[in-house]
Amino acid sequence: MQITEIFRSIQGESTHAGLPCIFVRLTGCNLRCVWCDTAYAFHGGTKMSVEEILASVNELSGRAVGQAFQPVQQPSSAEGQARKPVLQAISLVELTGGEPLLQPEILPLSEKLLAAGYTVLIETSGERFVGALPKAVIKIVDVKCPDSGESGTFEMKNLDAVDAKDEIKFVIASRRDYEFARDFTREHELAARVRQVIFSPVFADPEGKWPALDARSLADWILSDRLPVRLGLQLHKFIWDPAMKGV
């Protein structure tokens, strides 16, 4: 597999935002969104086997290769009942890109991560069919809005391939994008199909290539239309330099 980077960070997006997470960024993408903030993953990368990737994830997570997650026994509560064990390792892994579904080895990689006890997220552009992924994988599927330059690339079969644990995300750069996302959400009853529908405002490019969408404007639109969606901000860009890689 071609891998751009593997790193440990705080999950910045989705309903898992704020949690420690291991990211595996795969190299290559067949789309060219105007506001893409990971264009460095289009080319290059390092060739790694599934076993090498798993070993790297285990190391970053705090686990030894082949070991199960080790619980820390908590003191009993005041009622005398044992509390839920706390894991000593990071158990959340996201496979992202680029477009991770371009590499067929994504299937055995996700299966091995699941078998090792990880919770696995896959973030995808929505252009590729997600139905072949293991059932336990949590799919975060984009629908590209008009200002991305890639509107119309969404694989409509994905609407029937997602379920109540998955998420659908729209990255929104303008009022036009918002209206597209709003209408798509309503027409296809997305809130009834997935765990969460996420509207995420575009973050300004550090080099000024594109502007931000004011999050307050997006919040006002969502509230005005009473949409059953989550406003999603890129938390990691508030913690670290927005241009920084590996976070």
Specify the residue positions occupied by each region the protein language model found.
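A generic structural micro-feature
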Residues: 16-18, 71, 162
